[in-house]
């Protein structure tokens, strides 16, 4: 990678973006309106006293040993690693469908080291976890969101979907929360944040309020709405796994902090409800959830297609694995994997959560084979290895515990459990935006054809496209985007594989009706060859 790539993109970006108080009642008699006022006044006093008493009730305290804390943290990291490796061969190969029982799911001692050697990109979710953990280790728990955003933008490994869109946004000057907001990131409802939120729960053991605080702040880098709730949910499950023993309890408690009306919350709540209806039949629960919640409306690659990277549906498969796995490590990651879709990310999460709940020492030995061979591995550009992650997490967890009223006496740790945490405010992505059409374009922007016009009817669009000719990695294309005769912006397309723009053209919240989109590539070159594959069109009403 040439040193000037980031600077070049930033400069290109700068060029584009430059264009009354209550009266005290008088009680003369206890009749008529005076009596009503007296009763109301008395009720207010009693309510205030009751609230005061509740506020001053002694907090419940939870205690565990230092060894147990470290064992659970290690179980969380190792569980992620194993779950990811186990489910990697099936990633998105079973889209919106169950992996049938007739299809064996293999695991052997060499699977983990072999995958990491031959296909390290499979573990990209864990790499992001390690990237953020490494940043916190160097800068502390008070690390600002912009520092984590900067670290993500300069990561020296490939990213996808919402994470890659966030990296691109940050590099062109869109800071969090804009980098993760759906108006700037079509993948805001994807499962990217829940794939990278594990570390938050592992450094916040039993501390649900701090977990939410960190997750809200850091999750805005790459997500909003349901995508943000997905990461908060997963982080809370990890945190709660330190203080509870039943997966069902983790899910019940994590749901309490989410807005009840969010699609994400409703989906997971229905998983729990159907688990109680069909406690021995996870496939029945899967069918019900897939039928009702299986349509992806945000991710341009998944709209009107079986591919589903949506946060709520993939979190549902994680939840099914946890509930029907009932604390058994092998059963948990197996069921999660058989739910299909983003199998490796989902099994990494369910494996990490159940690994935290059990602790490293209680993960069956057959799953730990091959672990020693990969412990020293560090992702490219990072100073942290899988082996170091638990000890760094422990250091940050102890700091977090002390900051939140906990005490560390020798090898005994205790901390207060905060109750009645208010649910998060409701935020809805793609509000009044329903996919109406997915249309093949098969257009090119090049030196020969440097411009094109696309007509559509609706309130928004997203175009899947890419650079298809091999060009120098430090080259950056700029494409003007004009809607109905007005410059709506410009898309920057870096050629470097780590910096590519995953969804180069999109715009939402247009007035309903017919529109004309004009695209023109700037500074044409013989090497320019940009494919415009298909357009997803949105409208205020769902497609019939």
Roles of regions detected by a PLM:
Residues 38-48:
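Bacterial N-terminal signal peptides
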Residues 48-60:
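Bacterial Sec-dependent signal peptides at the C-terminal "C-region" and cleavage site
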Residues 70, 78-79, 128, 133-232, ...:
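Active-site cavity-forming subdomains of large catalytic enzyme subunits
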Residues 89-120, 126, 149:
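Active-site-surrounding "flap" and adjacent substrate/cofactor-binding loops of secreted or lumenal enzymes
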Residues 93, 97, 105, 319-397:
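Catalytic phosphate/nucleotide-handling subdomain of diverse soluble enzymes
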Residues 180-188, 199-207, 216-221, 236-340:
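Accessory "access/gating" subregions that flank catalytic or transport cores
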Residues 410-458, 466-472:
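Glycan-recognition and processing domains
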Residues 467-540:
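Beta-strand-rich ligand-recognition modules
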